Curated annotation (Swiss-Prot):
Gene name of this polypeptide: UL97
Record PROSITE patterns: PROTEIN_KINASE_ATP, PROTEIN_KINASE_TYR
Taxonomic lineage: Viruses, Duplodnaviria, Heunggongvirae, Peploviricota, Herviviricetes
Cysteines paired by S-S bonds: none
GO biological process, one term: viral process
Protein name (Swiss-Prot/TrEMBL): Serine/threonine protein kinase UL97
Domain of life: Viruses
Length: 707
C-alpha cells in the first residue's frame, strides 16, 4: 500500500542538544536565482559607485589642503591662479555629486516600487556608504531580518520564503518580544502620502514542528499570542508513539526545532495566508473564505458556496487537544490497534479511535473526504439510528474531528476488520451478503455522487462490527482509509480544505492515476495489473468515467474471493493462511519495497507473479468456470512477456495451483449455491473475474453487485 509521494521536509529528534536553531534556506527555482543575480550585480555596482565617490571626495579634500598651501605661496602674484584653483575645485565637486547621484539611482532601482526614500534621506545616503545586505533575498534598502520574508509567486500559489537562519530568528524574536516592525518608519508615509490603515492580519507562515523531550516525557510548550502554526507536510509521527510535536517556544527567540530536509519539489506546498475575524485570504488565486462558517459547524462539512471550488470547512474546538490529543495513552505499544505506511491507530475510548498520520497531507485529505462524504450523503438517504453521530455515512467511515498540530483525526471504533476476522461460517452467509452489498453501494456512491476514486480496496480497509453473541455474523461494515484516494480529473484545482485551527486553506493534490500507486498489489484489478506489468509508468486508462467505478468493483470482487476462500476451504482458516494467502502475499512485499526504492522493473516482475496467484484464486473457486480466465491470462503473458518471465510465471502458477485445488472447496461451493445469498455472492464473484482486459472496464457497473 505504499504511495510514492513527493519528498517533503521531514523532522528528526533534537536529541540532547539544548541550542535552538532555524531551518536552512529553501532552494529557489532558476527564475528566482536569476533575479538574485541581478540584485547582487546592482548592489555591487552601487557599492563600486560609492567607493569611487569616496575616493573622489578624498581627492577633493587633499586638493583643498594643497590649495591653502598654494595660496600662501602665491599671495604676491595675480589672482588668475586662484581662479584656476577655484575652477578645478568646482570640477571636482561636480564629479563627487555625479557619482553620488548615480549611486542613488542604482539604489532606487534595486528597491521595490513605493519604497524610495524622500529627498532628505537621499542626501543622508550620499554622505554614508551603502552596505550591501548579507541576505541573499533581502531588500537592498535594508539589511534587517524583516526583509528576509519576500513574496514568491508560482504557477500554483503565492508564498513567503525565509532567507537564512538569522533572518528567521530576527523575525520570530520581533514577533515574540513585541518589537516594532522595521517597516513602520515608512508604513504610514510612502511616496509623500499617507496610506489608509487596514484591519490587522495575522501572518500564518509555515514553520517546522518543534519537539522537546524532558526526562523521557514530551514537554508541551505554551503557545504565544502570535500563533505561528506548524503545518509541515512531513512532520514525523514515525519517530515513535508518545512523541507530540510542539509549538514554538517562548519570547527569548530560541527554538527547539527539528532537522529539515529542503527539497525543491516541496515548494509548491509552501504557502502563507492571512486571516482575521471577517475573512481568510488564501494563497489560492481568487479564493477567500469566511471564518464565520465555523460557528455553526461541529464536524468537517462541504460548503458549496462557490461553483469554482469544493470547500470543506474543518472546525476545531478550543479544548480539542486537551480532550483528544493529550488523552491518548501511547505508553504501551500493545495498545496500538493498527499500523501502516500512512500512520498508526490508537484507542481513545470505548467508542472512538485516533489516527496519527505520518504526513499532514494525509490528514488534510482525510478531513476533506470526510466533509465531502458527510455533506453529499445527507441529501441521499436517512442515516440508520444506530449510526447517527458515529461518522459512518453510506458505508463510508469519516473523521469527526481533526488537529493539524498533532496530525490527528478522530474516528468511530469498530470491532475488527475483514482481514483479521477469523470466524467464517456458511450459516451467516446472509450477513456476508449484506456487508458486501453495503461496500458496493459505498463504492458506487463515492464514484457517482462524490466523484472520487478510493484506489485502496482491501480487506484491511473494511472495518466490521460482529454480533457479540455470534462472532461469525457481521452486523456492520464500512470502508475506510482514503490515503490513496484521488478525485476525478474534472475536480482538479478545485478541492480545498479550510482549517479553523490555523486560518489557512490547503489544496488537495490533483489526480495522478499512476497505476503503481493505485491499490494493494495483491488486490489490484486484473486489467490494471496487466497494464502495470507491461509498463511500470502506466497511468489509469481514462477512456470514460465509468471505468473508475468498474475498477473499484473489480477490486471489491478480489476482496470477495479472498473471503470466500476462507469460508469455503474445508482445510480450515489456519491452513488457508499458511498456504493460500501466503502465496498471494509472497511477492506483494517485494513489490512494495521495489516501489519505495524506485526499482520499477522489479516491481513489475513481482506484480507478474502476483497475477499468477490471482489467477489461481479464481480457478480454485470457479472450477471449470474459471478455464476462460486461465487461458486468457496465459495467452497474454506469452504474447507480452520475455521467455524468462514466462517461465517464472508458469513455475509460480504451478506452485499456486498445487496448493489451491478446487477439490478443497467443491463441496462447500455446492452448499453455498443452495442458498439465495450464497448464489448472489458466487455470481458477483464470477462477474468481477470476467473483467480481465481494459475493454471490460467499459461495462455497466450496475451489473456488478446489483441491488
Amino acid at each position: 500500500m505504499s504511495s510514492a509521494l513527493r519528498s517533503r521536509a521531514r523532522s528528526a529528534s533534537l536529541g540532547t542538544t539544548t541550542q535552538g536553531w532555524d531551518p536552512p534556506p529553501l532552494r529557489r527555482p532558476s527564475r528566482a536565482r536569476r533575479r538574485q543575480w541581478m540584485r547582487e550585480a546592482a548592489q555591487a555596482a552601487a557599492q563600486a559607485a560609492v567607493q569611487a565617490a569616496q575616493a573622489a571626495a578624498a581627492q577633493v579634500a587633499q586638493a583643498h589642503v594643497d590649495e591653502d598651501e598654494v595660496v600662501d605661496l602665491m599671495t604676491d602674484e595675480a589672482g588668475g591662479g586662484v581662479t584656476t584653483l577655484t575652477t578645478l575645485s568646482s570640477v571636482s565637486t561636480t564629479t563627487v555629486l555625479g557619482h553620488a547621484t548615480f549611486s542613488a539611482c542604482v539604489r532606487s532601482d534595486v528597491m521595490r516600487d513605493g519604497e524610495k526614500e524622500d529627498a532628505a534621506s537621499d542626501k543622508e545616503n550620499q554622505r554614508r556608504p551603502v552596505v550591501p545586505s548579507t541576505s541573499s533575498r533581502g531588500s537592498a534598502a535594508s539589511g534587517d531580518g524583516y526583509h528576509g520574508l519576500r513574496c514568491r509567486e508560482t504557477s500554483a500559489m503565492w508564498s513567503f520564503e525565509y532567507d537564512r537562519d538569522g533572518d528567521v530568528t530576527s523575525v520570530r524574536r520581533a514577533l515574540f518580544t513585541g518589537g516594532s516592525d522595521p517597516s513602520d518608519s515608512v508604513s504610514g508615509v510612502r511616496g509623500g502620502r499617507k496610506r489608509p490603515l487596514r484591519p490587522p492580519l495575522v501572518s500564518l507562515a509555515r514553520t517546522p514542528l518543534c519537539r522537546r523531550r524532558v526526562g523521557g516525557v514530551d514537554a508541551v510548550l505554551e503557545e504565544n499570542d502570535v500563533e505561528l502554526r506548524a503545518e509541515s507536510q512531513d512532520s514525523a509521527v514515525a519517530s515513535g508513539p508518545g512523541r507530540v510535536p510542539q509549538p514554538l517556544s517562548g519570547s527569548s527567540g530560541e527554538e527547539s526545532a527539528t532537522a529539515v530536509e529542503a527539497d525543491s519539489t516541496s515548494h509548491d506546498d509552501v504557502h502563507c495566508t492571512c486571516s482575521n475575524d471577517q475573512i481568510i485570504t488564501t494563497s489560492i488565486r481568487g479564493l477567500t473564505c469566511d471564518p464565520r462558517m465555523f460557528l455553526r459547524l461541529t464536524h468537517p462539512e462541504l460548503c458549496e458556496l462557490s461553483i469554482s471550488y469544493l470547500l470543506v470547512y474543518v472546525p476545531k474546538e478550543d479544548d480539542f487537544c486537551h480532550k483528544i490529543c493529550y488523552a491518548v495513552d501511547m505508553s504501551d505499544e500493545s495498545y496500538r490497534l493498527g499500523q501502516g505506511s500512512f500512520g498508526e491507530v490508537w484507542p481513545l475510548d470505548r467508542y472512538r479511535v485516533v489516527k496519527v498520520a505520518r504526513k499532514h497531507s494525509e490528514t488534510v485529505l482525510t478531513v476533506w473526504m470526510s466533509g465531502l462524504i458527510r455533506t453529499r450523503a445527507a441529501g441521499e438517504q436517512q442515516q440508520p439510528p444506530s449510526l447517527v453521530g458515529t461518522g459512518v455515512h453510506r458505508g463510508l467511515l469519516t473523521a469527526t474531528g481533526c488537529c493539524l498540530l498533532h496530525n490527528v483525526t478522530v474516528h468511530r471504533r469498530f470491532h475488527t476488520d475483514m482481514f483479521h476476522h477469523d470466524q467464517w461460517k456458511l450459516a451467516c452467509i446472509d450477513s456476508y451478503r449484506r456487508a458486501f452489498c453495503t461496500l458496493a453501494d459505498a463504492i458506487k456512491f463515492l464514484n457517482h455522487q462524490c466523484r472520487v476514486c478510493h484506489f485502496d480496496i482491501t480487506p484491511m480497509n473494511v472495518l466490521i462490527d460482529v454480533n457479540p453473541h455470534n462472532p461469525s455474523e457481521i452486523v456492520r461494515a464500512a470502508l475506510c482509509d482514503y490515503s490513496l484516494s484521488e478525485p476525478y480529473p474534472d475536480y482538479n484545482e478545485r478541492c480545498v480544505a479550510v482549517f479553523q485551527e490555523t486560518g489557512t486553506a490547503r489544496r488537495i493534490p490533483n489526480c495522478s492515476h499512476r497505476l503503481r500507486e493505485c491499490y494493494h498489489p495483491a488486490f489490484r484489478p486484473m486489467p490494471l495489473q496487466k497494464l502495470l506489468i507491461c509498463d511500470p509508468h502506466a497511468r489509469f486508462p481514462v477512456a470514460g468515467l465509468r471505468r473508475y467505478c468498474m475498477s473499484e468493483l473489480s477490486a471489491l470482487g478480489n476482496v470477495l474471493g479472498f473471503c470466500l476462500m476462507r469460508l469455503l476451504d474445508r482445510r480450515g482458516l489456519d491452513e488457508v493462511r499458511m498456504g493460500t494467502e501466503a502465496l498471494l502475499f509472497k511477492h506483494a512485499g517485494a513489490a512494495c519495497r521495489a516501489l519505495e526504492n524506485g526499482k520499477l522493473t522489479h516491481c513489475s516482475d513481482a506484480c507478474l507473479l502476483i497475477l499468477a496467484a490471482q489467477m489461481s484464486y479464481g480457478a480454485c473457486l470457479l472450477g471449470e468456470h474459471g478455464a476462460a480466465l486461465v487461458s486468457h491470462t496465459l495467452r497474454f503473458v506469452e504474447a507480452k512477456m520475455s521467455s524468462c518471465r514466462v517461465r517464472a510465471f508458469r513455475r509460480f502458477y504451478h506452485e499456486c495451483s498445487q496448493t489451491m485445488l478446487h477439490e478443497y472447496v467443491r463441496k462447500n461451493v455446492e452448499r453455498l449455491l443452495a442458498t439465495s445469498d450464497g448464489l448472489y455472492l458466487y455470481n458477483a464473484f464470477r462477474r468481477t473475474t470476467s473483467i480481465i482486459c481494459e475493454e471490460d472496464l467499459d461495462g455497466d457497473c450496475r451489473q456488478l453487485f446489483p441491488e
